C-alpha cells in the first residue's frame, strides 16, 4: 500500500511540474513589457500630477503586482526544474549554521530563533545546496505562521523558532526538527500539505513544502509534521545514515 501511495505521489508530482513549467512560460513573457510600460507612464507624468493621484497609485499598484507575479513565476520555475541531487558526505549542522547566517540581521524583532544541534552526528550523503533550500523554506514558513498568529490574536506572544538535530541510532537516521509557536496546520489541509499549490498564505504559491518533500524524498528520507499541544507545529526531516 505504501509503495502504491508513493508511486501515485511521484506521478502527481511529475504532472504538477509540467503544469508549473507551462504556467511559468506563459506568464513570464508579458510581465516585463507590462512593468516597463507602467514605469514609463509613472516617470512621464510624475511631475504633472500629485503623489496621491489615481494615476500614481494605479501605476505603482501595477508595478508592485508585477513584482509579485515575477516571484511566483520564479517559484514555478524552481519547482518545475528541481535538479537531481548530487549528494556528498556532509555535516548537516554546518549546513544549518551557514544557512541561518542569512537570518541574523533579518529576523523580525518579535521572533527568536534558537538552535539545539547535537554535537555527535554522523556525516550524511547530502546535496548541501538543496538542504540549504529546505532549511530556508521551513524557517520562512515558521516566520509566516508566527506573524499570521500575531495578526489574529490580540494578546502579544513572543514568537519562537527552534531548530534541532538528533541522531536516532535504532532507526539509523538523523532528524532535523524545525519547531515554531505559530498557527499550526489546519486539519482541512493536513492531508494535502505536501501537494503543490496547497497554501493558506494570501500571496503564497503552495510550492515551498512540496519542494521540501520532494528534495528529502530524493535523499531517500521522509518529511513529517505534527501540531504541538502548546500551539504551533514541528516539521521533522528524517535522513538515512549510510
Predicted segments — roles?
Residues 31-67, 87:
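Histidine phosphotransfer helical core of two-component systems
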Residues 92, 184-192:
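Short helix N-cap motif at coil->helix boundaries in the Bergerat
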Residues 110-122:
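Conserved catalytic submotifs in the C-terminal HATPase_c
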Residues 216-217:
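Detector for a conserved hydrophobic position within an alpha-helical segment of the HATPase_c
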Amino acid at each position: 500500500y505504501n509503495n502504491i501511495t508513493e508511486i501515485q505521489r511521484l506521478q502527481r508530482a511529475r504532472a504538477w511540474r509540467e503544469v508549473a513549467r507551462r504556467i511559468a512560460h506563459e506568464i513570464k513573457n508579458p510581465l516585463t513589457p507590462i512593468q516597463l510600460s507602467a514605469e514609463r507612464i509613472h516617470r512621464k507624468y510624475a511631475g504633472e500630477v500629485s503623489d496621491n493621484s489615481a494615476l500614481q497609485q494605479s501605476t505603482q499598484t501595477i508595478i508592485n503586482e508585477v513584482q509579485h507575479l515575477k516571484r511566483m513565476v520564479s517559484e514555478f520555475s524552481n519547482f518545475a526544474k528541481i535538479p537531481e541531487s548530487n549528494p556528498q558526505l556532509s555535516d548537516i549542522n554546518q549546513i544549518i549554521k551557514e544557512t541561518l547566517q542569512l537570518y541574523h540581521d533579518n529576523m523580525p524583532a518579535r521572533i527568536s530563533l534558537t538552535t539545539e544541534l547535537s554535537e555527535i552526528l554522523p556525516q550524511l550523503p547530502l546535496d548541501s545546496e538543496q538542504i540549504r533550500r529546505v532549511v530556508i523554506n521551513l524557517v520562512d514558513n515558521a516566520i509566516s505562521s508566527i506573524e499570521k498568529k500575531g495578526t489574529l490574536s490580540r494578546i502579544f506572544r513572543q514568537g519562537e523558532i527552534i531548530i534541532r538535530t538528533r541522531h536516532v541510532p535504532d532507526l539509523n537516521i538523523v532528524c532535523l526538527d524545525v519547531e515554531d509557536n505559530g498557527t499550526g496546520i489546519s486539519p482541512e489541509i493536513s492531508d494535502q500539505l505536501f501537494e503543490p499549490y496547497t497554501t493558506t498564505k494570501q500571496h503564497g504559491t503552495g510550492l515551498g513544502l512540496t519542494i521540501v518533500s520532494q528534495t528529502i524524498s530524493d535523499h531517500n528520507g521522509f518529511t513529517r509534521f505534527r501540531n504541538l499541544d502548546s500551539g504551533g507545529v514541528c516539521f521533522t526531516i528524517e535522513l538515512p545514515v549510510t
